[in-house]
Each structure stands twice: as structure tokens, then as C-alpha cells.
Amino acid sequence: MKSLTWILGLWALAACFTPGESQRGPRGPYPPGPLAPPQPFGPGFVPPPPPPPYGPGRIPPPPPAPYGPGIFPPPPPQP
């Protein structure tokens, strides 16, 4: 019985480290080939519009500061 356990253990260990039917051969380089050049925007082609600065689900950028380093705030209005 001990030899049967030893043989089944070796068989299970070998099954873990040998390629099975579901495994493929070695993988090739990624990407498989050179990428295609981008489409030129010539006559008859219109470039896509730029994405909106903000939209649904996006937070709009903060407004610029009224003054920053080296720029003084405007003087108060005189009556």
C-alpha cells in the first residue's frame, strides 16, 4: 500500500508540472507585430473633436486664483 501511495504521489506531482491539453505553447512577443501608422487627416477627413474639459462624472477644474505670488490684489474702490 505504501508503494501505491508513493507512485500516485509522484504521478500527481508530475501532472502538476507537465503541460496539459489546455495549455498552449510558448507565447510570442507582445505586441505580435508593428502597429499600423495613424490615419492622416487629409482632404475629406475631419479630425475628431477634442474631448470636453469636463463632463458627466468629472469635476470641473478650479478657477484660477484672483492673485498669486508677485501679483497684488487690486486696490479697494474709492467712493
Swiss-Prot record:
Signal sequence range: 1-22
PTM comment text: P-A and D1A are probably degradation products of P-B.
Protein localization: Secreted
Residue positions where Pyrrolidone carboxylic acid is found in the record: Q23
Any one GO BP annotation for this protein: regulation of sensory perception of pain
Name of the protein this chain belongs to: Submaxillary gland androgen-regulated protein 3B
Cellular component terms per the entry's GO annotation: extracellular exosome; extracellular space
Expression sites (tissue/organ): Secreted into saliva by submaxillary gland. Not expressed in heart, brain, lung, liver, skeletal muscle, Kidney, pancreas or placenta.
Location of region: Disordered: 19-79
Family: Belongs to the PROL1/PROL3 family.
GO terms for MF: endopeptidase inhibitor activity
Alphabetical list of InterPro entries matching this protein: SMR-like (IPR026288)
Keyword annotations of the record: Pyrrolidone carboxylic acid, Repeat, Secreted, Signal
Pro residues: bias regions: 28-79
PANTHER family xrefs: SMR1-RELATED, SUBMAXILLARY GLAND ANDROGEN-REGULATED PROTEIN 3B
